Amino acid sequence: MNDFPWLTLIVIFPISAGSFLFFLPHRGNKVTKWYTLCVCSLELLLTTYTFCYHFQLDDPLIQLVEDSKWIFFFHFDWRLGIDGLSFGPILLTGFITTLATLAAWPVTRDSRLFHFMMLAMYSGQIGSFSSQDLLLFFMMWELELIPVYLLLSMWGGKKRLYSATKFILYTAGSSIFLLIGVLGIGLYGSNEPTFNFEISAHRSYPAALEIIFYIGFLIAFAVKSPIIPLHTWLPDTHGEAHYSTCMLLAGILLKMGAYGLVRINMELLPHAHSIFAPYLIIVGAIQIVYAASTSLGQRNLKKRIAYSSVSHMGFIIIGIGSITDAGLSGALLQIISHGFIGAALFFLAGTSYDRIRLGFFDEMGGMAVAIPKIFTMFSILSMASLALPGMSGFVAELIVFFGIITSQKFLLMPKILITFVMAIGMILTPIYSLSMLRQMFYGYRLFNAPNPSFFDSGPRELFVSISILLPVIGMGIYPDFLLSLSVDKVELIVSQFFYR
């Protein structure tokens, strides 16, 4: 047990501090923005301090545990803790949310509500990654849906209500399966309900019941990840959302689904996961090729990037299904890597849209001359997206490749076939990425600037782009730092649940 409730402070600080936004002057947009930025920065510093001075990297067990009775009638406990699995996603959440606050600087309409929604979403995401209680995990999972819906429906494009409704129908519908699974595990085999992750992980269930639980959780996490065919909400959502919201969606929200697959499906339901792992790998391989092919046919810039996100999530699914140390480590690295790259691409797409007010490729062209700084950053981060050596995506995908090849759960021919399909997807990735760059930045200039103040990237936008680029290069050159955070936990999961 930890004496000071560091994690509780980290979880409740953003939404608590955000509530004071409504006491700020209604017309003071600058005050609102600076206040939100200070809250996010302070939260990130607090998280970094807590992890640096109170977290032991060589301990695979849950640390900084906080366990308090909350609602006695429902046996609902406030139970928080972190380990190697949640360390990276929590830091990613803080980093991307802080930069998304900077990206949202042009937003002026209902500024206080907009920034409060971002901070509420921040608390929900940190709470999901640090929960050690199934019911608390579900509550935090639902908490961040409401801000996302409002951010979509109030600050989106022309079809924002359609995309927001589609988002909430998919996610709220899948949450029913999540709730059924949570209640099923919590109420099974005991006079007193227990939702403790640690206790649930050491329970055994009848095979049929474990499979039912697994399917329920899989549906919930497949929508959020997303896994085909439950991905269709994502392109519409990204196509209509403000690009700061897209940064949060691509950088953090999708990663919550992958985190749930590891934390609950792998750790709590290992026998069912052994049964479903081959199907996950097949779906992951199909998803890589399908989404990459579909991305190539998209005329809308943000929808093309959205489908590229779906394609890259396929590597995470394959890594989770491989049931190897290397595969799972590669999946966790890809979660962090794509969190940065996806957020950066949506940010740069949004800054381009701010200048020309065009979102379709057939209306663009020749932008490299007008905005050379944005062109340079877009080119570098597109290279990171297509897994250029020296970038984080290359290392993550290579480790996933190694994980599937060395897996003892599958025969040689299926592994060769899966590897071949993955290779096809990796060939398609540079095709749609380079095509995107060509259509946007090369050729004849097909557009007219909507106003005479058309200018290149400013200091704020350069700062956001470079702040994301540096970790991408850092992870590509020295991935061992990030891998070392989760290596002990990964070995514990794989050895304890699959080779015992």
Swiss-Prot record:
The keyword Transmembrane helix applies. GO terms for biological process: ATP synthesis coupled electron transport; electron transport coupled proton transport. One of its GO terms (molecular function) is NADH dehydrogenase (ubiquinone) activity. GO terms for cellular component: chloroplast thylakoid membrane. It is found in: Plastid, Chloroplast thylakoid membrane. It is a multi-pass membrane protein. Its EC number is 7.1.1.-. Keywords: Chloroplast, Membrane, NAD, NADP, Plastid, Plastoquinone, Quinone, Thylakoid, Translocase, Transmembrane, Transmembrane helix. HAMAP family: NDH1_NuoM (MF_00491). Belongs to the complex I subunit 4 family. NCBIfam families: NDH_I_M (TIGR01972). This is NAD(P)H-quinone oxidoreductase chain 4, chloroplastic. It comes from Pelargonium hortorum.
